[in-house]
């Protein structure tokens, strides 16, 4: 059994019982590709393991025009669709509730210009490599749409989204740091038409923002990419730290219900297996 079929069976088997829908045939299973030292070999390995897509993790020093050409060639040769370029720029990003709101993404003003420069370089690489989208954690979007901080963020994101739209690149918001309705509101208020969602339901749980099924129902066709990752809600006894990531299916993400809802909505994107538990990501994929 290929890794692709193994993961599909283990993670979402209950949701796939019943008639096979046409939309399912267009869904690809992929991973986040971190190593780009030999992209041809990496894509060859992914294809042989049964994957059909991947996300590329951005590194400013390595992502050159030469690499972009290599990515295009390897993608065509090995039939691996690169769905997004992912990165979270900034030297101070802290993944908790104490410092996170002041350090992650474009909501805080500290390092904002430097982050915007990196985001524009990511968009440029997407153009060079033929990648349709980039995505990131853009910060803890304020819940109050009348706040100065919210309005400032909307203006900054509109500028970045316009830069991407002019180059025919989409931007996906990685979920987690705000409630689903706040993210939907922000996308509407920015209003450039090229903003969508990379839906990471484990993040929404780990940040305590939503349960998995409600989030998918709310996001609807804004979801272009889906991260297969599992997690737990934050510990009420320690409300300053995120919940824990745990192996699929030992967390609180209701994968059978979620996959069924995605199929109902006609989802045709990629399900990307993400693992931040350790460095042996392919081992995790096999063991899941």
Q: PLM features: what roles do these ranges have?
A:
Residues 2-3, 8, 20-121, 127, ...:
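N-terminal pre-domain/capping segments
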Residues 4, 24-28, 39-47, 180-195, ...:
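Histidine-acidic metal/acid-base catalytic patches
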Residues 13-20:
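Hydrophobic h-region of N-terminal signal peptides that target proteins for export
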Residues 32-36, 57-59, 87-90, 139-141, ...:
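Active-site beta-loop-alpha junctions enriched in small/polar residues
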Residues 40, 96-196:
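Active-site acidic/histidine proton-transfer and metal-coordination neighborhood
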Residues 66-69, 95-98, 146-149, 184-186, ...:
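Short secondary-structure transition/capping segments
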Residues 67-71, 146-158, 209-217, 251-254:
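Charged helix-capping and loop-helix junction motifs
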Residues 93-95, 105, 142-146, 206-207, ...:
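A short acidic, helix-capping loop that chelates divalent metal ions and anchors anionic groups
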């Amino acid at each position: 059994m290929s890794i692709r079929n193994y993961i599909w069976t283990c993670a979402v088997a209950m949701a796939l019982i019943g008639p096979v829908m046409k939309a399912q045939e267009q869904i690809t299973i992929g991973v986040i590709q971190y190593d780009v030292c030999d992209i041809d070999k990496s894509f060859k390995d992914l294809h042989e393991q049964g994957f059909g897509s991947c996300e590329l993790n951005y590194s400013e020093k390595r992502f050159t025009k030469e690499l972009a050409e290599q990515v295009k060639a390897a993608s065509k040769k090995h039939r691996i669709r690169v769905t997004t370029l992912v990165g979270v720029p900034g030297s101070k990003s802290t993944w908790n509730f104490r410092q996170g709101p002041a350090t992650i993404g474009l909501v805080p003003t500290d390092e904002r210009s430097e982050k915007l420069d990196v985001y524009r370089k990511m968009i440029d690489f997407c153009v060079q490599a033929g990648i349709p989208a980039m995505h990131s954690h853009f910060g803890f979007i304020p819940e109050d749409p009348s706040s100065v901080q919210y309005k400032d963020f909307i203006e900054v994101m509109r500028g970045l989204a316009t830069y991407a739209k002019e180059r025919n690149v989409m931007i996906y918001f990685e979920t987690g740091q705000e409630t689903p309705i706040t993210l939907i509101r922000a996308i509407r208020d920015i209003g450039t038409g090229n903003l969508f969602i990379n839906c990471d339901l484990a993040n929404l749980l780990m940040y305590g923002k939503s349960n998995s099924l409600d989030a998918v129902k709310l996001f609807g066709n804004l979801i272009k990419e889906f991260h297969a990752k599992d997690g737990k809600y934050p510990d009420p006894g320690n409300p300053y730290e995120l919940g824990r990531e745990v192996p699929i299916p030992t967390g609180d993400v209701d994968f059978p219900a979620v996959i069924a809802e995605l199929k109902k909505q006609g989802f045709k994107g990629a399900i990307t297996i993400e693992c931040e538990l350790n460095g042996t990501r392919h081992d995790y994929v096999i063991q899941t």
